[in-house]
Regions:
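Intrinsically disordered, low-complexity regulatory segments
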Residues: 1-169, 173, 177, 243-244, ...
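Prokaryote-biased recognition of long, low-complexity C-terminal linker/tail segments
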Residues: 168, 172-248
């Protein structure tokens, strides 16, 4: 029986390997020997996302050229691909996953970690006929890692987080792939050259920066007053200043 542990990145895989009795580094993975996993066990890893959503032109050649007539872009199904610079590592991971009896998802314990893991597993065609477990920890200390592997969860418990993350990923794709050409083409019609990138997080953040810059640019100096007092008590005298942030109604 073979167990494959899927980490998110090389440094994470190394931390896992160091927590076991013996680990041997190979090309793109580690071979593990430990009483916790008596059978053949390997740790392999991604480089973060090994799989990306296809660009519009990969669905239809007409979407390669921006045109208002081609908007909106809504594929019937969403497809993924492995970027060229990540194919070597993906193929390493794919071979390990396909030969596994049990897969332990050990990416980061959050939605994005679920997305990274299941995107790789599904793209590798290794999402059926296997036992899936989930490592869920918040520390890379050796003791915490080992304890986490002793208390693996069923992967189905956290699978909804993958679905949430994938929905967010597709929504971001739709906003970017439709909003960017739409606003760029409309601005070009008004004589403003160039292309403009829109994003769910990027655009509101940019607007917040703009608002702050406008406040700085339009700032007007105004006179203000400070309340000060020289206080004399039986124990001595001292100067005091009113702090408006410390005043309280009584």
């Amino acid at each position: 029986m073979k167990t494959v542990i899927l980490a998110e990145k090389p440094s994470q895989a190394k931390a896992y390997a160091d927590s076991f009795s013996k680990a041997t580094r190979k090309d793109g993975y580690f071979e593990i020997q430990d009483r916790l996993f008596p059978g053949e066990t390997v740790i392999t890893y991604g480089f973060g996302h090994l799989v990306e959503l296809d660009s519009p032109d990969m669905y239809d050649e007409k979407w390669k050229q921006w045109s208002l007539a081609h908007l909106p872009i809504f594929p019937n199904q969403y497809h993924y691909h492995v970027p060229k610079d990540k194919k070597k590592q993906f193929n390493v991971v794919k071979r390990q996953l396909q030969s596994a009896d049990t897969v332990v998802i050990a990416t980061d314990s959050d939605r994005e970690g679920e997305l990274i893991a299941w995107s790789i597993i599904q793209q590798a065609g290794a999402d059926q006929g296997k036992t899936f477990k989930r490592l869920w920890i918040n520390s890379l200390e050796k003791e915490a890692i080992y304890q986490g592997f002793q208390q693996l969860r069923d992967a189905e418990e956290t699978y909804p987080k993958f679905e949430e993350a994938q929905a967010r990923q597709i929504a971001d794709w739709l906003i970017g792939m439709n909003g960017s050409p739409l606003y760029s083409l409309l601005l070009q019609q008004k004589g403003i050259p160039g292309s403009f990138s829109l994003g769910r997080v990027q655009t509101p953040t940019l607007y917040m920066i703009y608002q702050l810059q406008e406040k700085i640019r339009n700032f007007q100096k105004e006179p203000y007053f400070e309340g000060k007092a020289h206080v004399i008590t039986q124990n001595g005298a001292f100067d005091a200043k009113l702090d408006p942030n410390e005043t309280r109604a009584t």
